[in-house]
């Protein structure tokens, strides 16, 4: 059985301390790399969305204009909404109270 001397014990403690310090430095650098990587991904996605918006601006405008035209209803439809039997029954119950 080998006996550990005081010098060897101090040397092992020093190595352990350096190992812990190295782990913390590596973890810190890894966190920085992850943050920078996510930031780069975010910037690229924003730039891609801006470029695609500029390229397809007229197409998007036409699409939403057509959607807006489809949503406009004549005032006669708003005055006399089309009821299904269930919604008409519910409407009559609500009007009673």
UniProtKB/Swiss-Prot annotation:
GO cellular component term, pick one: membrane
Keyword Transmembrane helix included in the entry's annotation: yes
Originating organism: Dictyostelium discoideum (Social amoeba)
Name this protein carries in UniProt: Uncharacterized transmembrane protein DDB_G0280771
Key words of the record: Membrane, Transmembrane, Transmembrane helix
Sequence intervals crossing the membrane: 34-54
Topological category with respect to the lipid bilayer: Single-pass membrane protein
Major localization class: membrane
Subcellular compartments: Membrane
């Amino acid at each position: 059985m080998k006996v550990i001397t005081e010098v060897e014990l101090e040397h092992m403690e020093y190595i352990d301390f350096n190992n812990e310090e190295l782990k913390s430095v590596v973890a810190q650098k890894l966190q920085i790399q992850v943050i920078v990587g996510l930031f780069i991904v975010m910037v690229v996605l924003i730039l891609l969305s801006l470029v695609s918006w500029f390229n397809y601006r007229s197409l998007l405008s036409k699409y939403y204009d057509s959607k807006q035209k489809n949503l406009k209803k004549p005032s006669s439809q708003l005055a006399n909404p089309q009821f299904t039997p269930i919604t008409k029954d519910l409407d009559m119950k609500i009007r009673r109270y």
